Amino acid sequence: MAKITKLEVQKRNKERVNVFLDEDYAFSISAELIYKEGIKVKDSVNSEKLKVLANKDAIIKCREAAIKTIERNLKTEKQVRDKLNLKGYDEDSITKAIDFLKEYNFLDDKDYANKFVKDKLKCQGSNKIRYSLMQKGVSKDVIEEELSSIDKENEKESALILAQKKLNSLRKTEDDTYKISNKLYRFLLSKGYGYDIIKDVVKEAINFELYD
């Protein structure tokens, strides 16, 4: 059984407290945990108590890391989980951190997908958007639900704007309409647009019915 002889708030991180056992530095712990557990100088702690505190502290540190992960921009659950895994946190702490973020609506894959679709629709087709969301770990059902809300005319209009810009660039170095059409087709395909949209957009952009 050891006795807590000193509690010292860290100078560089006021959220962490250095704990001294029997006059010697032993470990640091979250100030939040000190408060919640009612830890005080002169308290006696055994190895089991120290193990419990270490586990709880690990959960708090993981939660704080999760919050920092989403501070600058939205993330999917998979993105947060992957980052926490890379930092070396255990699965139990990660799951609890994820649950915390969800509970306070800091993490919502459906909301993420909705915003992602609206943002990327300006410069990408539904195929590329679908692939990107899959890579980010969004479920297939959520992806398809959000993609089903896309107005095909709006998607086509965005593709046409991109095609016209690309066409202006291609015409500076190429005057063969057939070659331009093929390059334009490949360009739009790389942007994630489907064949039907590409066919119509290429026709409209260069006024050449190559795909009849």
Swiss-Prot record:
Keywords: Cytoplasm. The keyword Magnesium does not apply. Its main location: cytoplasm. GO terms for cellular component: cytoplasm. GO terms for biological process: regulation of DNA repair. It is found in: Cytoplasm. Modulates RecA activity. NCBIfam families: PRK00117.4-1 (NF001058). Belongs to the RecX family. This is Regulatory protein RecX.
